[in-house]
Amino acid sequence: VSWLAEFLLQTKNYKKNTIQTVKMAIESRKYMQKIVDDAGIEFDKSNCGILHIYKSHREFEHAHRVNELLALGGLERRRLTENEILTIEPNLEKKFVGGYYTKTDSTGDIHKFTSRLARVAMDRGVNFQQSADVKSIKVLGSEVKIKFNHKDFQDQIETFDMCVICAGVASHKFAKMLGDRVNIYPVKGYSITVPLPDLISQKKAPNVSLLDDEAKIVTSRLGKNRFRVAGTAEIAGHNLDILDARIK
């Protein structure tokens, strides 16, 4: 309830938040690319950009107003006609009034990226404790003590100089142990990955990432033989069930 209330109250700060989010995303993209370059991580990364497509003039004009805010945050996008859309992605049908193309965007297989990043981290001395249940985090003087249970032992206590909480929706629970308040809430998304097993399907599937605002879906090409489609945001708490109706 508190998250939803704060979420609704933030609508009055839409312009400011949009600009700040864009700036943060651009910086994040720079740092991620640096990590990829430094570590030599291969994860089917493609620098073909992303294409936002619109089927009605009303949507397209709204996108123009949004684009003005994105530009204030430093994001460069190009306004396109229908013919220009088909030039960038010839595999689309001719049924759009216009679009916006972000050339600087990229896509990749995030599972490959994170798993290979973990291996790089371990090679550099990082110790991962998998399947650990954190019971408490306490700051004692200049030290941080973390107590956790593991499948092989109980009430293990480790001491650290610093603690960085970066645990997705679990950050709320961990920050509370330190007297902090991180008011975030899980939103469940759905995606399917379509295999492209032959040359015909590989040639017909779009190469450029696509975002259809009306249909609320985004697509990405993962290498030459996979096509991912994601969409739907479901506010369902910590429920991990996959609803068949959502997939359909």
Locate predicted features.
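Active-site substrate-recognition segment that forms the wall
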Residues: 1-7, 136-144, 157-248
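Rossmann-like flavin
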Residues: 2-116
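Conserved active-site and cofactor/substrate-binding residues in soluble primary-metabolism enzymes
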Residues: 23, 27, 80, 108, ...
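Conserved beta-strand segments of alpha/beta enzyme cores
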Residues: 76-78, 127, 156, 181
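A conserved short coil-to-beta-strand element within the FAD-binding core of flavoproteins
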Residues: 80-91, 106, 127-145
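Short beta-strand segments that buttress and anchor functional surface loops
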Residues: 102, 146-150
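N-terminal Rossmann-like dinucleotide/flavin-binding domain of flavoprotein oxidoreductases
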Residues: 114-126
